[in-house]
A protein has these predicted regions:
Chain B
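C-terminal structural segments of small proteins and small subunits
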Residues: 30, 42-77
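Short loop/edge segments at beta-strand edges and connector loops
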Residues: 35-37
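A short, structure-level motif marking secondary-structure boundaries and short turns
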Residues: 5-7, 22-25, 56
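Local sequence-structure signature of Cys/Sec-based thiol-disulfide redox active-site neighborhoods
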Residues: 1-19
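Conserved helix-turn-beta segment immediately C-terminal to the redox Cys motif
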Residues: 19-33
Length: 124, 77
């Protein structure tokens, strides 16, 4: 029998980013990609969940955890999960000292916010 | 009705497929059961967690091994 590589039986963490138009949306997106690169989970499409595409919604329902990274307090990502009754853990990048429309998003900022979220996940 | 079992062939995927085939046989339905192992097709359907089950192109479950009874209730819907 071929070795299983489908991920069955492993903990599945799905990561969603707001990816909005502001600097904070860009930061949320970059942090999500960084977390995926670090092996925290698999990034998938928040917009597809919002559009209620069946595969994305079923995956969110079947995942061990859904990590939603919102860009600001408007909380569109969390709003989508609330509306659909899906379980999630929310992080908002402006909670980490980033100002919407003001802070320049550098590699250093991305790394700092990513590590802070990673720490919260590990300690949560 | 077309029922797709999405998974790459591990034991949980195979269990779901067996439960689906048993449910279809018991229901007397003329549903066609298809095993999908192609990762690109799973991605196209937005499936990020396996095993998953799609009915007529709509994903109804992911990350769970549904029982025969659960599949039967889906078939009857």
């Amino acid at each position: 029998m071929a070795e299983c590589n489908c991920g069955c039986g492993q903990k599945t963490n799905l990561i969603y980013a707001c990816s909005g138009a502001a600097n904070t949306g860009f930061l949320a997106d970059q942090v999500a990609r960084g977390l995926m690169k670090d092996g925290t989970g698999s990034m998938t499409c928040l917009a597809a969940v919002g559009a209620e595409l069946s595969g994305f919604v079923a995956s969110a329902r079947g995942a061990d955890s859904n990590i939603v990274i919102d860009g600001c307090a408007v909380g569109c990502g969390a709003g989508i999960f609330e509306r659909l009754g899906l379980p999630y853990t929310q992080f908002v990048v402006t909670d980490y000292g980033v100002k919407k429309g003001k802070t320049e998003i550098t590699g250093e900022v991305i790394e700092e916010v990513k590590n802070a979220i990673k720490g919260a996940l590990c300690n949560g | 009705m077309k029922i797709q079992v999405l998974g790459t062939g591990c034991s949980r995927c195979n269990m779901l497929e067996a439960n689906v085939r048993a449910a279809v046989a018991e229901s007397g339905s003329n549903a066609v059961v298809e095993k999908v192992t192609d990762l690109d097709m799973m991605m196209d359907l937005g499936v990020m967690v396996t095993p998953a089950l799609a009915v007529d192109g709509k994903v109804v479950s992911a990350g769970k091994v549904l029982t025969k009874e659960q599949v039967l209730s889906i078939i009857k819907e």
